[in-house]
Curated annotation (Swiss-Prot):
SUPFAM superfamilies: MFS general substrate transporter. The keyword Lyase does not apply. The keyword Nucleus does not apply. This is MFS-type efflux pump MFS1. MFS-type efflux pump involved in the modulation susceptibility to azoles, including fluconazole, itraconazole, ketoconazole, miconazole and voriconazole. Confers also increased resistance chloramphenicol and thiamphenicol, suggesting that it acts as a pleiotropic drug transporter with a broad substrate spectrum. Finally, increases the tolerance to cycloheximide when expressed in S.cerevisiae, but not in dermatophyte species. It comes from Trichophyton rubrum (strain ATCC MYA-4607 / CBS 118892). Induction: Is slightly over-expressed in strain TIMM20092, an azole-resistant strain isolated in Switzerland. Glycans are attached at N123, N221. It holds the Pfam family MFS_1. It is found in: Cell membrane. It is a multi-pass membrane protein. One of its GO terms (molecular function) is transmembrane transporter activity.
Amino acid sequence: MTEKGADGADGLTKAKSNAVSEDYETVNHVTGLKLAVIVTGLCLSVLLVALDNTIIATAIPKITDQFHALEDIGWYGSSYLLTICAFQLIFGKIYTFFPVKWVFLIAITIFEIGSAICGAAPNSTALIIGRAVAGIGSAGIFSGALIIIAYSIPLEKRPAYTGAIGGMYGIASVAGPLMGGAFTDHISWRWCFYINLPIGAVTILSILIFLKHPKQKLDNNQTWKARLLKLDPIGTAFFMPSIICLLLALQWGGTKYPWNNGRIIALFVVFAVLISGFIYFQIRGGDSATVPPRILKKRSIASGAFFLFTIGSAFFIMVYYLPIWFQAIKGASATSSGIMNIPMVLSLVVLSIASGITVTAIGYYAPLYYVSTVLTSIGAGLLTTFTTETSKGKWIGYQIIFGAGVGTGLQLSIIAAQAVLPLEDVAVGTVIMMFCQTLGGALFVSVGQNVFTNLLVKGVVNAAPGLDPQVVLRVGATQLKNMIPPQFLDGVQVAYNDALTKTWYVATALAALSVIGSVGMEWKSVKGKKIEPAAA
C-alpha cells in the first residue's frame, strides 16, 4: 500500500474510532440517587427473569398434584425457554429501531401479564400459556437492562454496574429452587408467580419516573410500517420455528420418544432446513438482518458469544443437577438443597462484582477470560469427583471454585460487546451474547437430562438388579430414603452419584472449551486504549 493509501486507511480508522467516541459522549450520564434508583430497578428486573428460570423446579410436584397433569411437567419449563429463545434476537432489532425506555417497559408488562396468568391459572393449559407469555417478556428484559446501562453510564465505569447485574442473575438462578420450595411448602406454589407482580411494579415505576429517554439515533420521520419492515420479518419467520423445533427435539428425544422416532427426526430435519434459510437471509440482508454479518464477523463478538455459550451451559447444568445430588445422596429436602448451594452463589456474586470493579480499574477485560476458564474448569472437574461419602468441606470448597470461575466471566462478553461496537450496535451485540447464554442453557440442560436419565437407568439395573429403574425415576431424589426398600438404597444412591458426576463431565468439557473464546478475545480497553499481548 502507498504511503498515501496507508494514511487514508489510518484516517478512516481514526474517523470510525472518533465516531464511536462521539457516540459514547452522547450517553445520558446519570449520577447520584437517580442512578441508584435506576440500577436498583434494573437489578430487580434481572431478578425476575433469572428467578423464573428455576423457581418452578421445586413447585412442580404440588402443581401436578393439583392439576393432575403429570404429562405436562416438561412443558412448565420448556414453554418459558422456547419463547425466550424464539424472541430474544428480535428484541435486539426492536431496541435498535424503537425507544429503549418504552420497549423495556413493554417487555416487563408482558412478563407481568404472563406471571399473573400463571398465578391465577385454573388448569395446566393456562399455566403453560402463562409461562409462554412470560417468556416473551423475559426475552427483552435482561438485554434491555444491559442496554439501558450502556445508554446511562460512561463505558469506563460500566463494568462495575454490569458486574452487579450479573451477580443478581447468579443469585436468582441458584436461589430460585430455594424460594420455590419455601413458597410451595409454606404459602402456595402460586406465589412463585405472584411475587413477580410487586417486584415488576417497582421496576416499572423506577424506570418510568427516573430514566430519561436515551439519545438514540432514531429516524422519527419513518412510518411505523417502515420501522417494522426493518425488523427482518422474513428472517424472523425462519428463525423462531427453527429454534422451537430444535428445543422440542432435545426436550422429547430420549425421554418422551426414542431418538430414532419419526417425530424427533422430523423436528431435526425441519430445524436444519429453517436455520439454513435463516442464515441465507442474514447474509443477504446485510445491516437489515436480525444478526448483521458485519457484527458477528468481529472477533470479539464471535469469541465472546462462544465463551458465554459454553460457560453459561456449564453453569446451568450445575444449577439444575447439583441440588439433586444433595437431595439423593445427602438426604436434603428441596429447601435444604438450595441452602447447600449457597457457597456457589456467594462466590459467584462476589467474583462477578469484583470482576466488574477490576475491569473498571485496569481497563482490560481479556485477562479475566483466562481466569474464568481456568477456575470454572477446575471447579467443574473437582465436582465430578464426588462420591456418596464426599465430606462437607469438599462440597463447599469445590462449589466456591466453580462459582468463582463463572462469576468472573459471566458479564465479560457484555463488556466486550460494548467496548468494540458503536453505540447504535450495542443493542444487537448485547442480545447476541444473551441469546447464546440462554440457548446454551436450554440445550445443555436437555442434554444433561438425557445423559443423567440414561445413566441412572443403567446404574440401577447394575447396582440393584431386583428393582425396576422406572420406580426410581418416579420417586424422585427427595423421596429416595422414604420410598426405596432399604436393601436397595445403597445401590440406588451409588447409581445416582455415578449418573450425576458423569452428567457433570458435560459441564467440565464445556468449561474447558470456553478457552477458545478466551484465546480469540481481542485485548481492548474500556478506557479507549488497545494493547497487544506480549509476543511469545
